[in-house]
Regions:
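Anion-binding and metal-coordination hotspots
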Residues: 1-332
Length: 332
C-alpha cells in the first residue's frame, strides 16, 4: 500500500499484515519475522487473529523485557551456564568466537484481539513465549563504552558542582541539601557529600591602612559542599545485565520450534536485507532525494525498484552459482 512518509511503522505493519492475510492461502504456515516495531497490542492481536506465527524483538520500553532479563539472571547468575544457541567468529582471526546464549521464559502481553462484526477490539493479557538471549557482542560493546560513560558523568557533575560552589551557604544543612539533587541524578556513581566550614574575612568599610589599634575586620562563617564519587558497582552490574541481553517473543511452542531455531529465524533478517538489496533501497541515497508528487508516480517508481531488485538478485544468484561451480571467487 501507499502511505504518507510520516506514517508510523506500526500503522504500516498493520496494513501490510492485512494485505498478506488476503493473499496467502494458509497463514498458519507463515511466520512473520520483524523488529520491535511489530510488538504492540494491536499488531500482535491482528497477527494472532489472522493465524500468523511471529518472531519479533521486545522493545526496551516494555517493562516485561526488564523483568524477564532479571528473571534469567536470577536463575543463572553466570552467563557461561546459559545454553549456547548460536556462535559467530570474533572481530579478528585471533579473537575467540562470540556466542549467543539463552533460554525461554513465559511472559504476558496486553493484546487487542479482533472481535466479530466490526465490534471494538477485546483487550486481553495473553501468555507468550519469550526467549532471553545473552550476546557476547553486546556485552563487549557495553564494556567498551563504560569508561566513556563514567568520564562523562564525572565531568557533568564537576561542571554543575562549580555552580553550587559559587554560592555561599549559611548553614551546613543548606549546603548538603544543595548537592542532594545532583547526587540523585547519578547513574554510574555513588556520591558522598561532605561540608567544609570556612571563615570569610569581610572588607573594611574604609580604604587604606587601618589606624593603629583598630579592631580586626569582621568575619563570617560559610559552608561549602564537597562530593566524592565512587563507581556504583551494583548499578553498573545491573546495567551490564540488561545491555548484554535482548528478548524475542514468539507464539511458537518450545516443542515445535527450539530456542536455536527462534534465534536463527530472527537473525536471518539481516541476511534477507543484505542479500536482496533492500538494505540499499532503504538508505537515504536511494529514496530520500526522489520527489514524485503524485501517488501514481510513486507506485510506478516502486514497481521499477522491484524489477531492478529482481534483476540484481538474479545476477547475484547466477554469479554465486558460477563461483561455487568453479571453486574460486571474483578478482577485484
Amino acid at each position: 500500500g501507499l502511505h504518507s512518509g510520516n506514517t508510523s511503522d506500526h500503522v504500516a505493519n498493520r496494513d501490510h499484515l492485512s494485505r498478506l492475510a488476503d493473499l496467502l492461502p494458509d497463514p498458519d504456515e507463515v511466520t512473520v519475522v520483524a523488529d520491535c516495531k511489530l510488538v504492540d497490542g494491536e499488531t500482535l492481536g491482528r497477527l494472532t487473529g489472522a493465524g500468523f506465527h511471529f518472531v519479533s524483538l521486545v522493545p526496551k520500553t516494555f517493562g516485561v523485557r526488564e523483568e524477564l532479563i532479571d528473571q534469567a539472571w536470577a536463575e543463572a547468575p553466570d552467563a557461561v551456564d546459559w545454553p549456547i544457541l548460536a556462535s559467530k567468529p570474533g572481530g579478528k582471526k585471533t579473537d575467540p568466537p562470540l556466542h549467543y546464549r539463552g533460554r525461554s521464559f513465559a511472559g504476558r502481553f496486553a493484546l487487542q484481539l479482533p472481535a466479530e462484526d466490526d465490534a471494538p477490539r477485546v483487550a486481553s493479557h495473553e501468555p507468550m513465549r519469550c526467549l532471553v538471549v545473552h550476546s557476547d557482542a553486546l556485552a563487549g560493546r557495553f564494556a567498551k563504552a563504560l569508561e566513556g560513560k563514567l568520564a562523562r558523568e564525572t565531568a557533568a557533575l564537576k561542571k554543575t558542582h562549580r555552580g553550587v560552589l559559587a554560592k555561599e551557604f549559611a548553614c551546613a544543612a543548606d549546603a548538603e541539601a544543595a548537592m542532594g539533587p545532583l547526587v540523585k541524578r547519578l547513574k554510574w556513581h555513588t556520591g558522598t557529600v561532605s561540608v567544609d566550614q570556612k571563615e570569610i574575612v569581610e572588607k573594611r568599610s574604609q580604604r587604606g591602612r587601618p589606624p593603629k589599634g583598630a579592631p580586626p575586620p569582621p568575619t563570617r562563617t560559610v559552608f561549602v559542599p564537597r562530593v566524592v564519587l565512587e563507581r556504583d558497582e551494583d548499578a553498573i552490574a545491573a546495567a551490564r545485565r540488561q545491555a548484554s541481553c535482548f528478548v524475542l517473543v514468539t507464539d511458537w511452542a518450545e516443542d515445535e520450534w527450539s530456542d536455536e531455531r527462534v534465534l536463527a529465524e530472527y537473525r536471518h533478517q539481516a541476511i534477507v536485507e543484505g542479500h536482496t538489496g533492500f538494505r540499499w533501497l532503504k538508505g537515504p541515497a536511494a529514496v530520500a532525494p526522489v520527489f514524485l508528487e503524485t501517488p501514481t508516480r510513486i507506485r510506478a517508481l516502486g514497481f521499477v525498484f522491484m524489477i531492478a531488485l529482481m534483476v540484481r538478485n538474479f545476477i547475484q544468484f547466477t554469479l554465486r552459482g558460477g563461483m561455487k561451480k568453479r571453486g574460486r571467487g571474483v578478482r577485484h
